[in-house]
Amino acid sequence: MVKKAVPSYHGGDFAGLNQKLDYLKDLGVNTIWITPIVENITEDQHDNETDTATYGYHGYWASDFTKLNKHLGKEQQFKALLDAAHSKGMKIMVDVVLNHAGYGREDYFNSILTDADGNSISMIRDSNNTISGDDKYDSLSDLPDFVTENKAVTDQLVTWQTEWMSKYSIDYYRVDTVKHVETTTWAAFKNSLTKVNPDFKMIGEYSGAGYANNAGELGTGTMDALLDFDFNDFAQNFVTGNISSVENSLQKRNNANQQHLCHGKLFEQP
């Protein structure tokens, strides 16, 4: 018997965030980063380690990239949030995932694409095209991994995410799991987005990237910025009183040529 986690789902919604825009603006916030907005699987027991169903309320376990996550609200509420934020001079940055789907969705995604002869095109990686331990060609946490080296798969993923941006005038995308997808896929994604909005920006999550290592993703027509993982160490040193170490680290970062790109200063507004 499967028990339901109590509570089984955490998180706010579009309407609640809309109500807090003035509060956030008073704090000096000019860009709001929100979770992936697409429909997610309702529960997961893939590891068989518990009889309690767990929920991907974080948004990273997509079940359908064409539908909105019902827990976040309806499309009218999402549009209202964007319109209200824009009216206050604020931007909305939506988290997106192109690397993987939610647990148990292999059959669904493998049924979507066909070639010119009517043969099925598998969107999800199997043992025939997996390289164990490889960042790009193996699954992350056993999640169904998209075969993004296949152009047909990339084109479909890019189309889904571009349609969301175009329909709702989303300002920016925060891109998940950058290191697990080919640079050619990110280039195709950026090209598609900038055809709709030439000023559209993407900030990537590349685990381990920092001021001294941009992983080759900056200045290549893909990511406009990367999350600065080095800052985690700076912050820990600061709160533990190691101020001299923080000063030295910040000085090195300030002197680095790509410093303004690595930690996303381009998203600051005048």
Model-derived features: positions:
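Substrate-binding/active-site clefts of carbohydrate-active enzymes
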Residues: 1-168, 188-197, 201, 212-213, ...
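Active-site-proximal helices and loops of the catalytic beta/alpha 8
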Residues: 86, 90, 159-267
